[in-house]
Every structure is written in structure tokens, then in C-alpha cells.
Amino acid sequence: MGLYARDAATGEYIKCNVSKGVILSTGDYSQNTRMLKHFCPEVIENNIQCLFTNVDVEGNFTNQGDGIQLGMWAGAQVQQSHAPMIHHMGGGADLAGVGVMGNAGFLNLDLNGKRFMNEDLPGQQLENQIELQKNRESWQIFDSNWPEQLPYMPAAHGGACYYEDYASEDEGPKNNTTYRNYKSPYQLEAAVADGRAVKADTLEELVAKIYPDDTAAQQTALDSIQRYNELAKAGYDEDFHKPASRMWAVENGPFYADKFTTALLLVCIGGLESDEDCHTFDADRNVIPGLYVAGNIQGNRFATEYPIGLKGVSHSMAMYYGYVAGKNALKDI
């Protein structure tokens, strides 16, 4: 038992023999198109791009699922259900994937001008809804009262939940706890200036900008906004049951919109079948002696997604089970 490694500089191979076992800790396969097509076809079908583009010294993507394939060749079984982590972080996203207003639960309309969901959703469920829409796109819409509304939004991954009152990059945020969860007038106006957001003095002007040459969608959007305003003022969303605490009438200009598209793939949660001792298993569910896993290659950690409300859950599990794998390999457990 052991491994072969190749020296990229010389091309020479190195053979390493081990006596206590092998620990596979090689990450996921989010840059391997063939594996994505097999295990997570929706990533390919929806043209989801991978957030991480790390490469090795030869320019090859590092997250190719090599360790999973090595384990399979040794007889290890792969977790059957996989969960691609595609956490939507809002429309008009910057290079870090963070949107103009994050995934805050403001009104959202499809390309026909219709409201189609309860907007108060976590990032993964929000992504699922966007993928069901025409062209996998929609419009987030809000008015000038957004600074007063942000504190009522959840502190979600990629969300916006507090307001910073600064109007220039030089001035900067006053409470720089995290760059992801605050929004400022400077950020919003910068997004308008570079085209990531749309601004208008009236709702009629706004819908004309976001639905150009489609008068039917413009009228449907105005009707949808009027309906949403009525529900917000009534304090009950009988259409999609969004909490009243996060519904506000969209009626005070200027008005803003930013386009939601598909989000970025963070990681594919689905590796080799494993347990709390980091073992791997063959087709008959027998432990494969001496073969352990830790990190994203370790399957059976999450069923559908990891809970983003539990901060650091993925990294902490990778660190902890790396320790467990090392300890068990040393003791031949």
C-alpha cells in the first residue's frame, strides 16, 4: 500500500510505501466535466461556473476528483446522492460572487414580470428557484427605503442585513465586520454606474428599462408590484406566504433593480462512502483496511447541502476528520 508521485520539474516518479494506511484528502471534482455530468448533471445543464479555478504548477485544475477515482479503483464506493453547493448571493454579482443587494428578500419578478416565489429563502433554495425560470434569470426590485429595511433581513451567507452610511470608496465602512453583509449608497450607485443595477425615478421608467420592447411584461410587472404592495400593506402574503416582517411596499423612488442569474458552484458534496472513523467501504459495505478519507472527498457528511447557518461547518469537519483519519490510521483502527 502506498502511492506514486511525479516530480513536475523533472518528470521522475517517486514511489512511497506505507505501513499504516493511506488517507485520501484531495477535495472534490467541481472542475471535472465528466464527473459533473454523471453525479451532478444540473451543474452542466444550467451552465453553472465553478468559483474556484485553482491550478497546479502545470496549469491543470486541482479539483478534478483524482482522489475519488483512486478510491474507486481500490474498490471504494461513492456516495449515491451528491449535493452541489450553489448558494445564490444576489444579482449583479461582483468577482467574489456577492450581489448588489445580496440575496436579501426583496421583491423578485421573472422575465414576464410575474412574481414567482417567497423571496425569503436561503441561498441554495433561491438558486433552485432561479434555475426554474426562463433563461434562468429574474429581477430583484426595491425602492429608496432599502436602508431602513436591511436590518430586518437575515444574516445569511451572501445576504445583506445592515446599512453602512458612506458615499465614497475613500470614506469606507465604519463597522467593517464583514464585507459581505453590509450595503452602502456608494456600493449601490457604483453598481448603477457600471451597469450591474438599474435605477429610475418612477416604476414605469424602471420596468421600461428592465423589459425593453416588451410592453406586456412591463404591464405585468406593474400589476405584480401593485399586488405585492397591497399584500405588504395588508400584512399577509396570501400568494407565497412570505413573513410580513420582510414585506414592504415598493412605492418610494428612486427605484432599483438588479438581474439574478445562476450562481457559482462552491463545491460538490459527495465523495467516497465513509463513517465517523473515516473508513471507506466496498460494494458489500465491508471496511477497506488501510484506506481513509477526510475533507470534501469524505462522503456521507451532508445529504442535500451543508447548513450555512452553522458557520465553518465544512472546514471544521474537514479539520476534525483529518485528525480522526490520522489517528485511526496510526492505530490501525
Enumerate the predicted regions with their spans.
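Active-site and channel-lining beta-strand-loop segments
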Residues: G2, A104-D120, G270-D282
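Glycine-rich loop(s) and the adjacent beta-strand/alpha-helix scaffold that form part
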Residues: R6-G91, H315-A318, V324
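An anion/pyrophosphate-binding glycine-rich loop and adjacent beta-alpha core
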Residues: I68, A74-K209
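Short, small/polar residue-rich loop motifs at catalytic or cofactor-binding pockets
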Residues: M101-N103, L266-C268, K311
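Short, glycine-/Ser/Thr-/acidic-enriched flexible segments
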Residues: A8-T10, G21, D28-S30, K114-R115, ...
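Conserved redox-cofactor binding core of oxidoreductases
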Residues: M1-E12, S19, T33-R34, L231-N252
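A glycine-rich dinucleotide-binding beta-alpha-beta segment and adjacent secondary-structure elements
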Residues: T202, D213-E305
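C-terminal structured subdomain/cap of oxidoreductase catalytic cores
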Residues: N17, A156, D170-G172, G270-I333
